[in-house]
Amino acid sequence: MGKRVMAVDDSATVRQVLQMTLAGAGYEVIEAVDGKDALSKLANTSIDMMVTDLNMPNMDGIDLIKNVRLSPGNRFMPIIMLTTESQPEKKLEGKAAGASGWIVKPFKPEQLLAVVRMICPA
């Protein structure tokens, strides 16, 4: 199996699209339903990259990134924000938290895959 990508989104439909797109390109995908679930799984699983939604219950994407960046082993792990938010202020907030990239929903799977391959080749 290829590199491991954690797909974090409260929408089962979006997680399914991420799973199909990334697994079809040779990535191993680990799913999480929100930031807290992602941190719990990250404590027991090593991953190479994360794709996360911004607006989620329990812990949003910004707080998730901030928490991930506290761990020395994940300080430089690529993290892509996948969100409906397109305002420049939100992008700056994401970048300040440590996001490596930003994709606005709705998105084409090919667009996501191009960004993932550029940041974290399988």
Stretches found by the model and what they are:
Residues T45-V51:
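Active-site beta3 strand of CheY-like receiver
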Residues F107-V116:
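C-terminal output helix
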Residues G26-V33, K41:
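Short hydrophobic/Thr-rich beta-strand motif most characteristic of the beta2 strand and flanking loop
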Residues M56:
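Receiver (REC) domain active-site loop signature in two-component systems and cognate sites
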Residues D53, T83:
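Active-site residues of response regulator receiver
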Residues G2-T13, L18-L22, M50:
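Conserved acidic segment of CheY-like receiver
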